[in-house]
């Protein structure tokens, strides 16, 4: 606990690139983090 290094938070967030996304999320083709 305390570290979410490999976790992708379950929030809907728009993005253009992976670095726009929190945690271990990547920017998916639909324009949202996942």
UniProtKB/Swiss-Prot annotation:
Pfam families per UniProt: Squash (PF00299)
Q: Which GO terms describe its cellular component?
A: extracellular region
GO MF terms held by the record: serine-type endopeptidase inhibitor activity
InterPro entries referenced in this protein's UniProt entry, alphabetically: Prot_inh_squash (IPR000737), Proteinase_amylase_inhib_sf (IPR011052)
Recorded hits in CDD domains, A to Z, give: PlantTI
| Disulfide links within the chain | 8-25, 15-27, 21-33
> Where does it localize?
Secreted
**Where does the record put the Cyclopeptide (Ser-Gly) cross-link?**
1-34
Q: Which family does it belong to?
A: Belongs to the protease inhibitor I7 (squash-type serine protease inhibitor) family.
Q: What does the entry's domain section say?
A: The presence of a 'disulfide through disulfide knot' structurally defines this protein as a knottin.
Q: What is this protein called?
A: Trypsin inhibitor 1
């Amino acid at each position: 606990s305390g570290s979410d290094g490999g976790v992708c938070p379950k929030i809907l967030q728009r993005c253009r690139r992976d670095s726009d996304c929190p945690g271990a999320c990547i920017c998916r083709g639909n324009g949202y983090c996942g």
